[in-house]
UniProtKB/Swiss-Prot annotation:
Keyword hit for Protein biosynthesis: no
GO CC aspect terms: cytoplasm; plasma membrane
Key words, A-Z: ATP-binding, Cytoplasm, DNA replication, DNA-binding, Lipid-binding, Nucleotide-binding
Top-level lineage group: Bacteria
Subcellular location: Cytoplasm
Pfam family, one: DnaA_N
Principal location class: cytoplasm
Function according to Swiss-Prot or TrEMBL: Plays an essential role in the initiation and regulation of chromosomal replication. ATP-DnaA binds to the origin of replication (oriC) to initiate formation of the DNA replication initiation complex once per cell cycle. Binds the DnaA box (a 9 base pair repeat at the origin) and separates the double-stranded (ds)DNA. Forms a right-handed helical filament on oriC DNA; dsDNA binds to the exterior of the filament while single-stranded (ss)DNA is stabiized in the filament's interior.
Binding site for ATP: G188, G190, K191, T192
Region (Domain IV, binds dsDNA): 361-480
This protein's name: Chromosomal replication initiator protein DnaA
Family the UniProt entry places it in: Belongs to the DnaA family.
Residue ranges, annotated region (Domain III, AAA+ region): 144-360
Length: 480
């Protein structure tokens, strides 16, 4: 057998994958090749079950495609764990066959590059004896983390750059950098993905770390259960024994006094022991209704970062990544159509793309701009009836207690100019209006004035907490 396939495969995957993904998942594999009776076989050994599962779910298909490309025939792939003492049960071998061969469905691989129109080979998993669950796998399950939510799979842009940078710093130095890390933003903007990515990165670096992701409602249920079963000592021991606590949607703590009391003491115990706490919320800490002041003050001990609605380019990138995961080809004009008309959150973007894909498949048509417009006609119609600049101007004027006429005036005093700039920024972000059209609506101003206003607000938000808070509140009000 030609023994050069694995080096060939490594070289190709290194070109196709981000360096971090390649080093973490592919470079750690050990390969053995054989060609018994003319059947080409490749056995890959993963260092642990976590890597094994990740490679099987995301990269096995692509390795099989490269094997068929190199050898000119389907190859048999086997993925296993190292033999230690007693013989380990290998993962079920996977044979790569041409399309049309009998077998099961192809595994999705969002990391693989787009494939040609020819049907790709399918991975057929042979039945095997159930494998024993390892201690590492059980430990990971207890974290309640989602293995799909990693820094690698997170689309980044201006909307989440600061939050991502802070999250990566926490992942590299848990308990010492930004404790607690408080991430806030609207629904569907990727807060949960980001905090899972922190947990996954920490666990991958040190599987001995005791990590727990918990939604606030589950934490509340744990408190109620401890109260009913009179087991508060066990409850306290568990939560205070964690190395990292990730708690999602803390706004739902409102008016749950006993739950807040228990979390307050757990928070103190963990931070004093330099254990990391990560929190998400849909609003800035001081705006949470029904939350004790002593908790809010402790959230200020670390770092508070906001995730904003994604900008146009980021929305397009999110759609293309989702299309890649769905293994469908989406032209830029289709992605731009969806991205221009859906501005609020990632879930809406992905939902719209799913609708287009389903519509195209149901009607037996390819995904085109015309098909996308047909599939989303109700959504596009609703969008066209959305915010007007006049409504934005009135809302901002009421908020800052100035006159709507001031939006059109030539006054340059700070109390007038800043709200006007905020209104221009909101008009650019929340409506499809062009810069010249926005300028015309603000007293016939030039488009360069609008551009300057938008850039000013964007830059000021990074350092001016009050302005950032104002823009966040106005955005939420205008979106209803």
């Amino acid at each position: 057998m030609n023994q050069d396939f694995w080096p060939f495969c490594l070289a190709r995957l290194e070109q196709e994958l981000p360096q971090q993904q390649f080093n973490t998942w592919i470079k750690t594999l050990q390969a053995a090749e054989s060609d018994a009776d003319g059947a080409v076989a490749l056995t890959l050994t993963a260092p642990n079950r976590f890597v094994l599962q990740w490679v099987r779910e995301r990269y096995m298909r692509r390795i099989g495609e490269l094997g068929e490309e190199f050898h000119g025939q389907p190859i048999q792939l086997e993925l296993q764990l190292p033999v230690a003492g007693a013989k380990s049960a290998p993962v079920a071998p996977a044979r790569v066959r041409p399309a049309g061969a009998n077998g099961g469905a192809a595994a999705n691989s969002p990391m693989a590059p787009p494939v040609s129109e020819a049907a790709p080979p399918q991975i057929i998993v042979r039945p095997s004896e159930p494998e024993p669950v390892s201690a590492n796998e059980l430990a990971y399950d207890k974290t309640r983390l989602n293995a799909d939510f990693t820094f690698d799979t997170l689309v980044t842009g201006r909307a989440n750059d600061l939050a991502r940078a802070a999250a990566m710093q926490v992942a590299q130095n848990p308990g010492t950098s930004y404790n607690p890390l408080f991430v806030y933003g609207g629904v569907g903007l990727g807060k949960t993905h980001l905090v899972h990515a922190i947990g996954n990165a920490v666990y991958r670096h040190n599987p001995r770390m005791v990590i727990r992701y918990v939604h606030v409602e589950d934490y509340y249920a744990d408190v109620v259960r401890a109260y009913q079963q009179k087991s508060f000592d066990a409850f306290k021991r568990y939560y205070r024994s964690l190395d990292m606590l990730i708690i999602d949607d803390i706004q739902f703590f409102n008016n749950k006094n006993r739950t807040q009391e228990e979390f307050f003491h757990a928070f103190n115990a963990l931070t004093e022991a330099k254990k990391q706490i990560v929190i998400t919320c849909d609003t800035y800490p001081k705006d949470i209704q029904g939350l004790e002041d002593r908790l809010i003050s402790r959230f200020d001990w670390g770092l508070t970062v906001q995730i904003e609605p994604p900008e146009l380019e980021m929305r397009v990138a999110i759609l293309q990544k989702k299309a890649e995961a769905l293994r469908v080809s989406v032209d830029d004009d289709v992605a731009f159509l969806i991205a221009k008309n859906l501005r609020s959150n990632v879930r809406e973007l992905e939902g719209a793309l799913n609708k287009v894909v389903a519509y195209a498949r149901f009607h037996g048509r390819g995904i085109s701009l015309e098909v996308a417009k047909e599939a989303l006609k109700d959504l596009l119609h609703a969008h066209n009836r959305q915010l007007s600049i006049e409504h934005i101007q009135k809302t901002v004027a009421d908020y800052y207690k100035i006159k709507v006429a001031d939006m059109h005036s030539k006054k340059r005093t700070r109390v007038i100019a800043r709200p006007r700039q905020v209104a221009m920024w909101l008009a650019k972000e929340l409506t499809p209006m062009s810069l010249p059209a926005i300028g015309e609506a603000f007293g016939g101003r030039d488009h360069t004035t609008v551009l300057h206003a938008c850039r000013t607000i964007t830059e000021l938000r990074l350092g001016d907490h009050q302005l950032n808070h104002d823009v966040h509140v106005l955005t939420q009000v205008l979106r209803g």
